[in-house]
Amino acid sequence: MTTPSTGSIESRIAEQLGVRERQVRAAVELLDGGATVPFIARYRKEATEMLDDAQLRTLEERLRYLRELEERRSAVLESVAEQGKLTDELRAAIEAAETKARLEDIYLPFKPKRRTKAQIAKEAGLEPLADGLLGDPSAEPLSAAAAFADPEKGVADAQAALDGARAILAERFSEDADLIGTLRERMWGRGRLAAKVREGQEEAGAKFSDYFDFAEPFTELPSHRVLAMLRGEKEGVLDLNLEPEEPQADPSAPSSYEVEVASRFGIADRGRPGDRWLLDTARWAWRTRIMVHLGIDVRSRLRTAAEDEAVRVFAANLRDLLLAAPAGTRATLGLDPGFRTGVKVAVVDATGKVVATDTVYPHVPRNQWDGSLEKLAALARAHQVELVAIGNGTASRETDKLAADLIAAHPELKLTKVMVSEAGASVYSASEFASQELPELDVSLRGAVSIARRLQDPLAELVKIDPKSIGVGQYQHDLSEVKLSRSLDAVVEDCVNGVGVDVNTASAPLLARVSGIGSGLAENIVAHRDSNGPFTSRKALKDVSRLGPKAYEQCAGFLRIRGGDDPLDASSVHPEAYPVVRRMAKAAGGVDVLIGSAATLRSLNAQEFVDEKFGLPTVTDILRELEKPGRDPRPAFRTATFREGVEKLSDLEAGMVLEGVVTNVAAFGAFVDVGVHQDGLVHVSAMSRNFVKDPREVVKPGDIVKVKVMEVDAARKRISLTLRLDDEPGVAGGGRERRGGEGRSGGGRPAQGQGGGGRQGERRGGARAPQQRQGRGGGRGQSAPPPANDAMADALRRAGLVDPKQR
């Protein structure tokens, strides 16, 4: 038995990626040898001829899929061979199948299954009748069937024989691999997903109101809309129907699919006695078997495509959050807001060490506002606090006001307040690692510590939490657990290794994400560090228990040792390339002269240092790294300057131009914090004069942006914003650009939005960026005329975020 070789897998991947087969082959060999994607992308550029991390991740996914396909192909060949039905033609078809779906189509007639009506009919000797009627439509069906009536075989009469023959033909039609493949693609290209509200669910399912009478082609449905409708169905609000094509004017006329089935088997109405029966059989096969089977396939394809896109968005948002600008080594006061239980307070010094904790009760029911301000001021003064990090959960607005009053009352402290996502903080607080890291602290206070540290270094703190708990995705609880975890783990791995890790200060969870390490080795590194003191060289890592040559090769370049024996250990230059640097240093007059000297480095000819092991890409990377060794690729920390006097929703006026922070990006737009405790929405159509397909092309979480207020709805706490600062409130086209066909009911399409879940679902599924609200700003602008349009409500309705009770 033969199957396509690994080489054919590599050639297919190369074709899909648009690269050379030898590049794929080299990458596959490295992956199979235990190398990680970050290591290959950074340190094996010559081998892969410059494949980057994104290409390698795609390659890794395709390799997994194609290997699973080959395993399944082998199993199918073995199964069919055991049945004694493996002809040369069938083998060729199985070996030529390029997708799992095509392979299963071919295998369907041979797949072990429970006894069907068709099998029972065959056992009763009715297959010759079926073959005869299909081969000779001139025969009158009922008359021909009379000869096959046999009560002893369970065939009571001629009609029963005819029913058995129909079952045999229907199964045959529905198991024709080529026919099924053709109909599947036709259905995908022509079909649409329709939704109707279930009777009596109008009020209870109001958040899905955009889908109460809705239909859209499969190929045009964005992921968030598919997931919204599937959730509406799951919650018992919507009935979904897969329509193979647009409804016909004459419902009794055969569909194009029935015509295709009939044509495939030479069935046509030529006035012969058997034609009508055969056409009815083709229709019956389509409606009772093929359409059901393809409906399951298409639904699965819709869900898979929607999940893939949602996972992509989740991963992209997570990447932005992890790579957000770190505030750095600045003493920070963390506030974990709460009402009855109080605001938990934690002060961490410049290194992240907890130096003080407390609980204050500024809000209801105790209302100890002034006393809370005094306590916070004393803590800030005693520990030279520079930043105040406020969690964005319950009571965050009120606690943000407390911080604003603290800044106003004590300008000498020179504090800056920043709203920080607290998503996942409670998960961390109750985790085993938190109890090991902060054993002396009550669980309730650990969240405040995490909030403060997130501002100092988002990446180092967020890696302690399961990525799914960070919550920056759409419909994340509706997604495949395996698919989501695999994608998010890859993002965390890429981010951690892209930034690099200080081996002498990193936590075990952070070390565990470094290439080649894992949780077990991470614990061993920390234990070795605790027992023997800080590492003074990368070579000393080899003394760590169970850290062998392969692990050392994979991790060494990503681990930094600052102030150690060798200055190169603080850079991303891999130890295996140190001889190259020594040669450079010899030419320049020493390593110390070389490092950080842009002029000296630029005077060197990279080509002169290329050898049989290290090519030009690696040498060029080394020169770039030596210019700024250990550089942090993350952006510089800055916060938005909110306008003074604009602190609550009622302070906003249409026409104001404000600075704000992007807190979350969804498929339909971006949410922006402008300092009034309620995020505004920039719809995707208000981001640019040009068409924007993906809002992330324009902004990402954490970006500082200038926005214009287009409309304010205080009753519903809705703010409509635009990035197009020349838009005018009340002018058609301002803030929201209409596109043909949007917003139609009964087969129309809402604008790019979420549907089910509403704003609350978005907020739960979208964490704020680490840096958000700052408390100081400039003067207040002139009042603008009241809005004359309803652009904001329109955008929110189309996004599925409107409260229907207030329509």
Task: Put a short name on every predicted segment.
Residues 89, 102, 106, 418-419, ...:
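Long, charge-rich intrinsically disordered scaffolds of nucleic-acid metabolism proteins
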Residues 298-305, 310-315, 469-500, 608-654:
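Long, charged amphipathic helices and adjacent flexible linkers at domain junctions
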